[in-house]
Curated annotation (Swiss-Prot):
Lineage of producing organism: Eukaryota, Fungi, Dikarya, Ascomycota, Pezizomycotina
Protein family according to the UniProt entry: Belongs to the SWC5 family.
GO CC, one annotated term: nucleus
Protein name: SWR1-complex protein 5
Keywords: Activator, Chromatin regulator, Nucleus, Transcription, Transcription regulation
Subcellular localization, as worded in the UniProt entry: Nucleus
Amino acid sequence: MESLTIRRQEERKPLAKIDGATIDVDAIWAQMNAPDSKLGLAPIPDAQKQDETPASDTEVRDQENANPTEPNGPAEKGFQQTSEMVKIKRTYKFAGEMITEEKIVPRDSAEAKLFLSGNGDGEVIPVTEDEVANMTGKGNENTSTNNTLRIRRPLRKISRFDPNPSGMIKKSWGKQSLTETGARTGAGQENIRGPKINTVEKSRLDWVAYVDQEGISDELRMHSKAKEGFLGRMDFLNRVDAKKEEERRNARLRGV
């Protein structure tokens, strides 16, 4: 009980006293709350304002220099893109099929470098900005078409236990004669000719296309440099060990 009484007395004590104050606190508080009161935050000196103005101008100037005007940017970018893009046309025979490829790639890409390094069967044509835009539009259309086809529900497959009143299953299972197939294939490939490539060459073409698509050429270059550096260090250490062993052998021979 005594502890509760002491606690209540402490809670009832005032937080501050104004008995010994030399100014009228209530009057000053009322004056500060008055609507026409001039008391408040101190005004900013003129010298400080003058110091802030050049700083803001400098910041604006730096931002203008960092971000150039937009009209020149796209034009320069488009010119650079047009001058570095090339069109690759390639025709080859793989797995019994004649394949014709035509694509626009950057000149410094892995696929373009491989094509320019040792492939004389195709052609490289500098492209313009309009052709790049057209090829990009075709790519987007093909992508949207593929996405549309992916979300379609596949049709129900015909079962041999289903009724067949129209004879469709017999027609689908009918074998075509080899002469008709050969004649049709020969007519289609009569005007298309190209070199025959093996699986290794086809894999190399697919790999460079994948490298350009994923954008990992820089990582592969750094990895190859690191690998060469490791092999070089190992070779150096092996040479040092061989030299030490030779010195030991010479010392033993001199001692004998």
